[in-house]
Amino acid sequence: RMPAQPQTLRKLADLQGHAETVWNLAWNPKKSLLASCSTDKDVRLYSYKKLSSGISGGSETVFRLEEVIPSGHKRTVRCVSWSPTGDILATSSFDSTVGLWEHIPDDIRSSMSDGSPDWECFGTLEGHESECKSVSFSYNGNFLASCGRDKSVWIWEVHPDADFECAGVLIEHTQDVKTVKWHPKEEILASASYDNTIKLYIDDPYYDWVCYDTLEAHDSTVWSLSFSPCGRYLASASDDLSIWIWCRLNADDCKKRGIKPREKASNREGEGWYPSYRIKGHFTRPIYSVSWAAGDASDPAQALG
C-alpha cells in the first residue's frame, strides 16, 4: 500500500559543474563523499557535512567539491560504484571499459608533489564489445559486475591485492543490458534489460555462475533495480511508467502460492521472486532510477523513491 500522505522532500543543494549530462550518482559507504559521472567524461567528488544554522538550533547540509577526476575514458562515463570499504571507485563507460580508481593514503600523498590527485587509476577492465552501461560491487567486495549493450553481464572476482579476474560472462538477455545490482547480504546478482526482463544469478557450486530466475512483469525496458536493505524485496523501474516490487519467497512459500521457478540452481532450488506490488499511475514519463532509503523498513512502499 502507498502512504496516505507522502512526505515532502526538501532540496539540500544544487551541485553544478559538469559540462554535459549527468548520468549517475553514488554515495561512498564509509566516507562523506558523493561521486557523479557525466557525458563530459569526468568524475566529480563532493564532500558533505552538517553545520549548525545558528540561533534556530537547526542544521544544514553543506556540499563542497573535493576533486574533479579526468577519467581517461574516451566516451561518456555512464555509472559509478564504490567498493564496500569506500577506497575503490569503479566507472563504466560507453568506450566499453571499466575504470578502477583507488584513494591515495595521506602518508603517501605527503611525499608527492603538490597538486597530486587524491585518487588515481590503477586498472582498466576490458571485455565488453560495446557500450558498458553499469557497474556494481558485491556487498562484501569479493565481486564486481558490469553489463553492456552487447547483451552480456561480466562478473569479476576481486583478489586481496586488488587484482581483478574474470569469473564469468553471462549472456542470458536477448537485448541491451541496462543495469546490474547486487543483493545487500548475499552474492546474488540482478540484471535488467531492454528485453523487458530481470535476470537473477548465483555462483552455483556445480555450474559456476548461472541464471536461476527470470522475472517478467514489465511491458517495456527495465531501466533500474534496487534491493531493499533487508534483501527481501527488489524494486524495478521501467519505461512502462511503473515500478514493480518483487518479494523473495522460499521453496515452501512458492509451493503455497503455486509458483514454479523458471530456472534452478543446486543451492537455490525451489526459491522464487514474486511480483507483490505495482506502483503505477503516478508517472507520465519513463522511470530511469529507483532507490531504497536506508534501514530495514517493514513496509517496502514506505522506503522507496
Tell what function each PLM region has.
Residues 47-57, 102-114, 157-162, 202-207, ...:
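Short loop/turn segments immediately following beta-strands, especially the blade-tip
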Residues 26-31, 80-86, 136-142, 181-187, ...:
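Loop/turn segments within WD40 beta-propeller blades
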Residues 43-48, 98-103, 135, 153-158, ...:
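WD40-repeat beta-propellers
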Residues 37-40, 91-95, 146-150, 191-195, ...:
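Conserved strand-to-loop turn within each blade of WD40 beta-propeller repeats
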Residues 31, 40-42, 95-97, 150-152, ...:
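Surface-exposed loop/turn positions within WD40 beta-propeller blades
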Residues 15-22, 69-77, 118, 125-132, ...:
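WD40/WD-repeat beta-propeller blade N-cap
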Residues 3-18, 60-67, 117-122, 272-276:
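A short helix->beta-strand "capping" segment at the edge of beta-propeller domains
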